């Protein structure tokens, strides 16, 4: 099966190549093995002796792990033996571990006094290791029995969802070594317990689109949901929050500090971790260090914000546009088709003879009458357009939400995603904008003459009568 736009094809098994011979290397304590694997190829790693971890999650002995389309590092505290090609002895893992222990002290204090646990915000430039640090702190927290709430505010990379989303998830169990954060129920069964993410749709890379009004509104709704969860879940309240952010917020652009301030206020942040940017660290120190938090108990407990500077790992590598596009396509493929490992021997840089079991899913295809759907366009006004054409009072923003029933189906809709919201099909545009997401449809084909679209859905049955959001870049219209 092949779908244009996502290159959804099974790799050919016509050619066979001999796998690379395995090589065993002993890693000294406090060192890490850094590796990069292209999409379409795999590398298999087995821990032979000692202990090791990937972003805080321990590797099981004699278990083969398979990686594809990733850039990561395996670290050992006490030394280990595995099959490796490169060993790095300069690593900030001790620094990151100290952050974990400091957060644990705050969590113990929160449990003893009945206060909320630490709320951590991670800032830094693009490709500085922010998400990796989020995984490490989350994995260490779950390892000692904590249940952190993890928030992803970076729309370019989905967490337990597709790209173009902002999510929040409670982690009660370990993180999946091979699949990063793990999998949601929409990705099928998993050896590691699945997570239940709360998902909001934000299909743009820049949080400052439309002066940041749309992004701010979604952040506020996400923060409200997280705060409500902490109020009802004692374990989550004691453990606190870990918030990952997009690297674009660290740039010297007007509105970035205001956006960071909005995030700090909405989530009542107590600790700001700045990775790899002296300039950003100075700005955060000036604006937030030792300032009272925005929590309701801040006045009574004299709770104040701490700003901490962390080193950027030497293992961080730049991810170009082509790689990020491949990441996005891979996440979308995984959402609908599962995560099958390429079956060709030519694709495998095999360091072990054994393999792991991955799940292949079969999405349900159906044809829909486009005009029968309550589809909302998500368009951004260009600088040349007349602002008088928009009604900011309707949405609190200059963005336009137009019901799909009044529009003809557009061929540009092909190979795009539709987000099914929890909002009613008759809800107001503002409610549709702020609604969380139920699931996604992939538009495989468009018949403009008949007004029909063929979509793929992760589950069978009729599409629920809910408002649906799509994104059209105004520069391409």
Swiss-Prot record:
GO terms for biological process: mRNA 3'-end processing; tRNA splicing, via endonucleolytic cleavage and ligation. GO terms for molecular function: ATP binding; polynucleotide 5'-hydroxyl-kinase activity. Residues 1-23 are annotated as: Disordered. InterPro entries: Clp1 (IPR028606), Clp1/Grc3 (IPR045116), Clp1_C (IPR010655), Clp1_C_sf (IPR038238), Clp1_N (IPR032324), Clp1_N_sf (IPR038239), CLP1_P (IPR032319), P-loop_NTPase (IPR027417). It is found in: Nucleus. Keywords: ATP-binding, mRNA processing, Nucleotide-binding, Nucleus. The keyword Nucleus applies. Coiled coil: none annotated. One of its GO terms (cellular component) is mRNA cleavage factor complex. The keyword Transport does not apply. ATP binds at residues 32, 71, 127-132. Required for endonucleolytic cleavage during polyadenylation-dependent pre-mRNA 3'-end formation. Component of a pre-mRNA cleavage factor complex. Interacts directly with PCF11. Belongs to the Clp1 family. Clp1 subfamily. HAMAP family: Clp1. This is mRNA cleavage and polyadenylation factor clp1. It comes from Aspergillus niger (strain ATCC MYA-4892 / CBS 513.88 / FGSC A1513).
